[in-house]
Curated annotation (Swiss-Prot):
Mn(2+) binds at residues 169, 200. It catalyses: alpha-maltose 6'-phosphate + H2O = D-glucose 6-phosphate + D-glucose. It comes from Clostridium acetobutylicum (strain ATCC 824 / DSM 792 / JCM 1419 / IAM 19013 / LMG 5710 / NBRC 13948 / NRRL B-527 / VKM B-1787 / 2291 / W). NAD(+) binds at residues 4-70. The record marks 109 as: Increases basicity of active site Tyr. The gene is malH. Keywords: Carbohydrate metabolism, Glycosidase, Hydrolase, Manganese, Metal-binding, NAD. Induction: By maltose and other alpha-glucosides, except sucrose. This is Maltose-6'-phosphate glucosidase MalH.
Length: 441
C-alpha cells in the first residue's frame, strides 16, 4: 500500500494537534510516510511542531517529520496539502467581530462584514499556498478547509480555475453528527443526505437511512422543539455560544419547515437577535483566545517540557476524519459521497451556473462529480442569489483593488441595514487591515 507525504499548511494552528492525532488514528486507512508543517509564523509553529514531533516519536516513529517556514522545503515531494490557515490570527478575528458590532451589525468570523474582512485577508494566503503546491508538487491535491470557505472557494474558481483544490467545510459534518445522535444512529455515515446551498448557507432537503427510509419527519419533530441540541453533540462545537446557535436552529427551521437549516443561517435571518445577544467587549474570538488557544498552547508546552505526552489532555479531532475520507477518495477512487464546495454548472437547475455551491459530490481519483439537485424553492434561491453576489463582489474587489466593489459587497449583505452603515464599517476595516488587504482605490 502506497504511503503518502502530507504537508499541513497552518502548522501553528490550534487545530493542528487534533488533526495530527486523527491522522495517526487512521494510519490503517491512510498510511503516511512523511508529515510536514508549514507556517509563516516560525515561533508559533515551533510550539505546536515541538509537541507534535514528540507525539509522532511515541505513536509512529517511522514517519519522517519536518516543520519549516521555507515553501520549497514544505511543498516539495507531497501528495496532499491540508490547509487550515488564519491570516491575521485571532487578533484580527477579534476586530472582524467587534467593528461591525459597534454599528449594531452582526460581528461574526465568516458572516457579514467580519467574514468579508477575513475573506479579503485569506484570498492571497490561500492562492499563495496553491501556487507553491503547483510549483513544487504539480501532481498534489490541496484539501482546503480554511475559512471563510465560500469566499476562498470563489477566489480559487476565478483566479486559479484549473487547480487541484477541493474546498470542504466541517460545519455540515458537525450538524450531521448531532442528527445521527438525535436519531439514535451510530454514525452520520448511516445517513444519505441531500443538501444544497452555499458554504455556511444551506439546507438539508432529504435524509434517509441505508434502507431508504425517510428520517426527515423524526428530525423535524426534534428540531421544531429543541433545535440541534443533543445529549453529546459533536466534539468540535461545544462552548456556550455554540449551544445557543444549536438551540436557535428551531427558529431558523420555523421559517421553512420543508427543509432543515445550516445553523449559520441564524446570522442572516435573525441578525437583530444575534446583535442583541452579543457582548461587544467580549466576542467569540476572545472566547477562543482564552479557551482553546490557551489550552492547546499550554498542553503543547507541557509535552515539550516533559519530552512526553504522558498526562497530555489534547484529544483526537475525530470529526476531522472527513479529511482522511477525502484524501482516500482521491487516492483510492473510493467514490465516497461528500459535501464539497464546487462550481454549480447546472447541478442546481435554477441557480447561477458559476456560483460556488455546497452540494453532495461523488469523489474519485479525478476529483468531485457533483450530483444533480434539480430546482430549488424561491425562498432559498432568493437568499442564495443575494449571498453569492456578495461573495463574487468580494473576490472582484480583491482582484481589482476596488473600494467601490467592496462597499457594494458589504451593502448587499443581509446583515447590514444600509449603504451608509456599510461604508462606516468598511472605512474602519480598511484602517485595521492595512497589513493584510491590497490597497483599495
Amino acid at each position: 500500500m502506497k504511503k503518502f507525504s502530507v504537508v499541513i499548511a497552518g502548522g501553528g494552528s490550534t487545530f493542528t494537534p487534533g488533526i495530527v492525532l486523527m491522522l495517526l488514528d487512521n494510519m490503517d486507512k491512510f498510511p503516511i510516510r512523511k508529515l510536514k508543517f508549514y507556517d509563516n509564523d516560525k515561533e508559533r509553529q515551533a510550539i505546536v511542531a515541538g509537541a507534535c514531533e514528540i507525539i509522532l516519536k511515541e505513536k509512529a516513529p517511522e514517519i519522517e517529520f519536518l516543520a519549516t517556514t521555507n515553501p520549497k522545503e514544505a511543498f516539495t515531494d507531497v501528495d496532499f496539502v491540508m490547509a487550515h490557515i488564519r491570516v491575521g490570527k485571532y487578533a484580527m478575528r477579534e476586530l472582524d467581530e467587534k467593528i461591525p458590532l459597534k454599528y449594531g451589525v452582526v460581528g461574526q468570523e465568516t458572516c457579514g462584514p467580519g467574514g468579508i474582512a477575513y475573506g479579503m485577508r485569506s484570498i492571497g494566503g490561500v492562492i499563495e499556498i496553491l501556487d507553491y503546491m503547483e510549483k513544487y508538487s504539480p501532481n498534489a491535491w490541496m484539501l482546503n478547509y480554511s475559512n471563510p470557505a465560500a469566499i476562498v472557494a470563489e477566489a480559487t474558481r476565478k483566479l486559479r480555475p484549473n487547480s487541484k483544490i477541493l474546498n470542504i467545510c466541517d460545519m455540515p459534518i458537525g450538524i450531521e453528527t448531532r442528527m445521527a445522535e438525535i436519531l439514535g444512529l451510530e454514525s452520520r455515515k448511516e445517513m444519505t443526505v441531500k443538501y444544497y446551498g452555499l458554504n455556511h448557507f444551506g439546507w438539508w432537503s432529504d435524509i434517509r437511512d441505508k434502507d431508504g427510509n425517510d428520517l426527515m419527519p423524526k428530525l423535524k419533530e426534534h428540531v421544531k422543539k429543541y433545535g440541534y441540541v443533543a445529549e453529546n453533540g459533536d466534539t468540535q462545537h461545544t462552548d456556550a455560544s455554540w449551544n445557543d446557535t444549536f438551540a436557535k436552529a428551531k427558529d431558523v427551521y420555523a421559517v421553512d419547515p420543508s427543509t432543515l437549516p445550516n445553523t449559520y443561517l441564524k446570522y442572516y435571518l435573525f441578525p437583530d437577535y444575534v446583535v442583541e445577544h452579543s457582548n461587544k467587549e467580549y466576542t467569540r474570538a476572545n472566547e477562543v483566545m482564552d479557551g482553546r488557544e490557551k489550552f492547546v498552547f499550554g498542553e503543547c508546552k507541557k509535552v515539550i517540557e516533559n519530552q512526553s505526552t504522558k498526562g497530555c489532555k489534547m484529544e483526537i479531532d475525530e470529526h476531522a476524519s472527513y479529511i482522511v475520507d477525502l484524501a482516500r477518495a482521491i487516492s483510492y477512487n473510493t467514490h465516497e459521497r461528500m459535501l464539497l464546495i464546487v462550481p454549480n454548472n447546472g447541478s442546481i437547475e435554477n441557480f447561477d451556473s458559476t456560483g460556488m455551491v455546497e452540494i453532495p459530490c461523488i469523489v474519485g481519483s479525478n476529483g468531485p462529480e457533483p450530483l444533480t439537485m434539480g430546482k430549488i424553492p424561491q425562498f432559498q434561491k432568493g437568499l442564495m442569489e443575494q449571498q453569492v453576489s456578495v461573495e463574487k463582489l468580494v473576490v472582484e474587489a480583491w482582484k481589482e483593488k476596488s473600494y467601490q466593489k467592496l462597499w457594494q459587497a458589504i451593502t448587499l449583505s443581509r446583515t447590514v441595514p444600509s449603504a451608509k452603515v456599510a461604508k462606516q464599517i468598511l472605512d474602519e476595516l480598511i484602517e485595521v487591515n492595512k497589513d493584510y488587504w491590497p490597497e483599495l482605490n
